[in-house]
């Protein structure tokens, strides 16, 4: 029975692989439950990736500023060691007195998002869960440690479960605060461990044990069933920190758990995650573009958020290429999603409530793009959708045209439910005449072939 399920799911997921680009290193899972969950995840299309932590207090670029690499920009006149100590000291200031995960979940539900990924620990090592293996956690360090909701991850996951989101835990494999990763005995020249493992094997052994223990805390049931384990920090592989020892128990607790050991390739990267970019063509396996709503992953005081129109256009392109969009939105230092972001997200959600049929539960089609138009298909292939991505600063034209994907009968405009005619020219070009009175937003069309 398991072999038959596995074969069916593999065929369903790869049935149009010949139409798409290939990526080196992707390995399809062999666990039928993982394949089944991947298929369900591919129905969702739109999720949120939340970065929150010490870096949110001053509103800087996540924890990267404590990494001593040439591309990092720190305040003029600051020393590296002085800056690092200042950053660690933010653990005494992190005090999200307005922490409201229910508000987060409501905002993202209103946006039409269907899955979430939350940073339990970024590279700086500061844990947003109550870890037994370090004191560098919100539950033990700083003023929020006395708050009854100090085990932040628990409340975040629970809030999103009530909204039927798929639940994802982000976890950084590198931990710059841990003495077994960045030893205080040596300088820290870059993001990697700052000692030679062959000279200090016990240090590395201690780090592997520490990481396995923390992963066990997150995946072992204390935080409920998880759908996605999203592992960041690709300069260390999951294999190096005992991931293969953790996963069997994690999947016993959370059957079908999707593991994303990102950028590593191989059997534990169940879907791939291009960052701040979209692949040029369709891909032949599950993938997600993780992209920010503003310029940065965490909250900043001057975010320069993308418009709802731009996010919708991006989502249409990603969906037509077979992927999902994890949109980065960071909570404020006080613990809410700011209204400036919520307004944009609600506008996206209003469009998806009317036009989401062209996005959710769809699969790719051979002719997937013509200019500003992105095509998707229903799972059975009997219905096609065309999303006209309306570029910034442009108005809707009275008609839109494409080649191929010739409609059979009338075309439904999902934005307002009206049916319109489509004409086919001698050269095979399809022209659809848009009804008057449409809002200036991307247009989604539905038709049969």
Task: Describe every region a protein language model picked out.
Residues 5-7, 123:
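N-terminal targeting/docking segments
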Residues 1-4, 108:
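Positively charged n-region of N-terminal signal peptides that target proteins for export
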Residues 17-19:
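Short, composition-biased linear "edge" segments at structural boundaries
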Residues 8-15:
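Bacterial N-terminal signal peptides
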Residues 22-449:
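Mature catalytic domains of secreted/periplasmic carbohydrate-active enzymes
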Residues 7-8, 49:
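General helical structural elements
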């Amino acid at each position: 029975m398991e072999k038959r399920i596995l074969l069916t799911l593999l065929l369903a997921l790869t049935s149009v692989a010949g139409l798409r680009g290939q990526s080196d290193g992707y390995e399809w899972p062999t666990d039928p439950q993982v394949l089944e969950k991947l298929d369900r995840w591919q129905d969702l299309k739109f999720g949120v990736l939340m970065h929150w932590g010490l870096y949110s207090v001053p509103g800087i670029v996540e924890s990267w500023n404590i990494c001593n690499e040439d591309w990092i920009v720190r305040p003029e006149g600051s020393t590296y060691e002085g800056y690092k100590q200042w950053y660690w000291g933010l653990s005494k200031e992190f005090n999200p007195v307005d922490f409201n995960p229910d508000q987060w979940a409501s905002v993202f539900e209103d946006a039409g998002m269907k899955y979430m990924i939350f940073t339990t620990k970024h590279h700086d090592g500061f844990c947003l869960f109550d870890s037994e293996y370090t004191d560098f956690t919100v539950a033990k360090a700083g003023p929020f440690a006395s708050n009854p909701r100090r085990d932040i991850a628990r409340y975040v996951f629970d809030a999103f479960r009530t909204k039927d989101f798929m639940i994802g835990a982000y976890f950084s494999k590198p931990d710059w605060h841990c003495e077994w990763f960045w030893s205080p005995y040596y300088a820290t020249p870059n993001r990697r461990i700052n000692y030679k493992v062959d000279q200090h094997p016990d240090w590395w052994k201690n780090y592997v044990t520490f990481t396995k223990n923390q992963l066990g805390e997150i995946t072992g049931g204390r935080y409920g069933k998880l759908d996605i384990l999203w592992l960041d920090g690709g300069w260390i592989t999951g294999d190096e920190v005992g991931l293969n020892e953790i996963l069997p128990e994690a999947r016993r607790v959370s059957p079908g758990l999707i593991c994303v050991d990102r950028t590593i390739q191989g059997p534990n990267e169940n879907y791939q995650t291009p960052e701040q970019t979209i692949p040029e063509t369709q891909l032949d396996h599950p993938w997600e573009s993780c992209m920010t709503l503003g310029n940065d992953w965490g909250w900043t005081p001057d975010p320069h958020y993308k418009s709802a129109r731009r996010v919708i256009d991006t989502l249409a392109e990603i969906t037509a290429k077979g992927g999902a969009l994890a949109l980065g939105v960071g909570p404020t230092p006080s613990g809410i999603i700011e209204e400036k972001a919520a307004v944009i997200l609600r506008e996206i959600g209003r469009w998806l409530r009317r036009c989401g049929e062209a996005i959710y539960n769809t699969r790719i089609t051979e002719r997937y793009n013509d200019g500003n138009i992105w095509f998707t298909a229903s799972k059975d292939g009997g219905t096609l959708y065309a999303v006209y991505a309306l570029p910034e600063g442009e108005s809707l034209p009275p008609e839109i045209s494409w080649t191929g994907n010739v409609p059979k009968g009338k075309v439904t405009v999902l934005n307002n439910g009206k049916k319109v005619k489509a004409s086919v020219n001698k050269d095979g070009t399809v022209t659809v005449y848009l009804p008057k009175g449409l809002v200036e937003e991307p247009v989604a069309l539905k038709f049969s072939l």
